Amino acid sequence: MKRAKKAKKEKKESTPLPFPYLASIVLLPWWISLSFKKCFEPWVTHWCNTRQSKFFLNDIQEKGTLERFIELEELFLLDKIIKEYYPDTHIQRLWIRIHKETIQLVKIHNEDHNHIIFCLSTNIISFTILSGYSILGNEELFILNSWVQEFLYNLSDTIKAFSILLFTDLCIGFHSPHGWELMIGSIYKIFGFAHNDQVISGFVSTFPVFLDTFFKYLIFRHLNRVSPSLVVIYDSINEELI
């Protein structure tokens, strides 16, 4: 029995940490997504510019475009007001400016259209690659998991308690709502959803509370079973910070 444990330990120690596998998980989806964007960006841009579409891709583009058209309409009304007091050359320059603004508005609309298409495509590619890694790289994931568990096990109880408090305060603590708002806003922008302040505010005000309670329960249950001394250190540090 002892020989088996010793052989298993020696095998674990002799197994190298899969740094290439870890680097490929992080860099390969990004590299493939970037290559996809560079290769297909001219084709998608040409397709979007030549395609006559009667509908907007999403509510965000529609809202932004309507705001710009309102600005152009205000310029047109201003033109009617001041044309009696200024010469025709000034009116002509104003019309040229309105024409340029309209062209620029169409370009911005097409760029937003292309951006959302590329974001959706790259997200799908990244998800597919990571899913393939999780299915095909079981052995590498097992080795990586064993190294992470060993690293966490070798940490002192004080460092573990401090890390838990730091993680919970950043993700679900008092200052976390600002981070949640930025993250949800970025997700909305990437996937082309309409920005809804009421939904974001309701989510930020409720979800971190439930998540905080759930995490504290899991942490207390796990630490109380694994290391009761760590629970004492965690409570003492938490009381001092509060």
Swiss-Prot record:
The reaction(s) this protein catalyses: K(+)(in) + H(+)(out) = K(+)(out) + H(+)(in)
Principal location class: plastid
GO cellular component: chloroplast inner membrane
GO molecular function: antiporter activity; proton transmembrane transporter activity
InterPro entries according to UniProt: CemA
Record field: transmembrane: 116-136, 200-220
Gene Ontology biological process: potassium ion transport
Chloroplast among keywords: yes
Location of the protein in the cell: Plastid, Chloroplast inner membrane
HAMAP family: CemA_PxcA
Alphabetical list of PANTHER family matching this protein: CHLOROPLAST ENVELOPE MEMBRANE PROTEIN (PTHR33650:SF2), CHLOROPLAST ENVELOPE MEMBRANE PROTEIN-RELATED (PTHR33650)
Protein name stated in the entry: Potassium/proton antiporter CemA
Organism of provenance: Chloranthus spicatus
Gene designation per UniProt: cemA
